[in-house]
């Protein structure tokens, strides 16, 4: 889904359902200080920056199809799916290594922004206004989908709003280039992206696409809801019985398919109809300092939170599973309490910032 990595604004606009695991960060405050020797982590950071600059200076180039990892990939696909190896080589020979994608992947918005900065960009007045306009335009279909699936229409609209600003920015990278670049030259997550490349090749065959013309995010996410190829194959649905091409799933231009597919994704991940996503809380300072935004698990109960000094208003049962989520404001640390549906949203994009943004945009649209 958002893996969602160049300027902060560009990064935010290119969020996908495939975002990396977020890292805990705090707003950087400039303060006078004496110069001190660089620590190992600072040196490593400097070296990483130099490496990024070096990669960014490279030009796009074709892949060497004699590389052992690419040969193994072709052989595996050919064997598993009965696709002629020569056909696969012909396709992959047209893929291009894109160095800017590698650089972008090192700077996802979830890593470089505090919550209040992230929210300002994704829950802006303009995005709320466009969301209400979008909802009014598609009100009938959204109402039908909500009644059928139990997935809140506001959440469906918010997902599309956060992902692509209601279809305005679906990405300009060739998906083939993105997935080959990350699958063969981004070691940290190469296995994942090679799997997505496999799904993309199969999806293009299933949907009768020209794989050289499909465009998406720099992480390979596609369409208005930014589905990765594996999610497209598994969760995308034909949302209209009267579609002009029955059985085809068009997440680029068909809003019936787009809205129904987002709802289907949430249904498959056990969205609880009518239940809240999160709520605000007053949290003791010692707990705030220990929070880790990489944690996505409902690792506490509401009763345990109350017992630890967390104050909040809720009529939910004491044994309700929850997560305490860091939510920095412009004035300092803060936290919120996420519930089951919050966890479901993080299955779409593994980021607590993303899930909070979707919830807050949805609430602003009501």
Model regions and ranges:
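Bacterial N-terminal signal peptides that target proteins for export
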Residues: 1-8
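C-terminal motif of bacterial Sec signal peptides marking the signal peptidase cleavage site
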Residues: 14-17
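Solvent-exposed loop/turn segments at secondary-structure junctions
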Residues: 95-96, 163-167, 221, 272, ...
């Amino acid at each position: 889904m958002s893996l969602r990595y160049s300027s902060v604004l560009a990064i935010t606009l290119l969020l996908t359902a495939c975002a990396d695991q977020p890292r805990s960060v705090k707003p950087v405050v400039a303060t006078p200080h004496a110069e001190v020797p660089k620590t190992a982590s600072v040196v490593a950071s400097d070296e990483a920056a130099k490496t990024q600059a070096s990669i960014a200076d490279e030009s796009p180039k074709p892949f060497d199809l004699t590389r052992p990892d690419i040969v193994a990939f072709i052989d595996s696909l050919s064997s598993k799916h009965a696709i002629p190896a020569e056909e696969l080589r012909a396709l992959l020979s047209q893929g291009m290594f894109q160095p800017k994608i590698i650089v972008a992947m090192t700077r996802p918005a979830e890593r470089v922004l505090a919550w209040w900065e992230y929210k300002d960009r994704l829950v802006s007045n303009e995005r709320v206004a466009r969301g209400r306009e979008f909802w009014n335009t598609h009100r009938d279909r959204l109402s039908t989908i909500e009644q059928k699936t139990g997935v809140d229409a506001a959440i469906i609209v918010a997902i599309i709003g956060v992902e692509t600003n209601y279809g305005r920015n679906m990405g300009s990278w060739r998906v083939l280039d993105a997935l080959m670049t990350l699958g063969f030259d981004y070691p940290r997550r190469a296995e994942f992206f090679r799997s997505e490349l496999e799904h993309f090749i199969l999806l293009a065959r299933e949907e009768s696409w020209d794989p050289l013309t499909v465009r998406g995010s720099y992480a390979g996410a596609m369409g208005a809801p930014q589905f990765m190829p594996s999610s497209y194959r598994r969760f995308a649905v034909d949302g209209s019985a009267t579609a002009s091409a029955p059985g085809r799933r068009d997440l680029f231009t068909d809003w019936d398919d787009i809205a129904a597919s987002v709802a289907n994704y949430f249904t498959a991940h056990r969205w609880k109809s009518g239940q809240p996503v999160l709520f605000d809380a007053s949290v003791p300072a010692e707990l705030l300092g220990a929070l880790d935004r990489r944690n996505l698990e409902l690792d506490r109960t509401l009763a345990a939170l109350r017992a630890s000094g967390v104050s909040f208003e809720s009529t939910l049962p004491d044994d309700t599973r929850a997560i305490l989520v860091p939510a920095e404001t412009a004035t300092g640390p803060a936290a919120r309490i996420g519930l089951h549906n919050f966890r479901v949203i993080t299955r779409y994009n593994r980021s607590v910032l993303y899930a909070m943004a979707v919830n807050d945009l949805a609430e602003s649209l009501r």
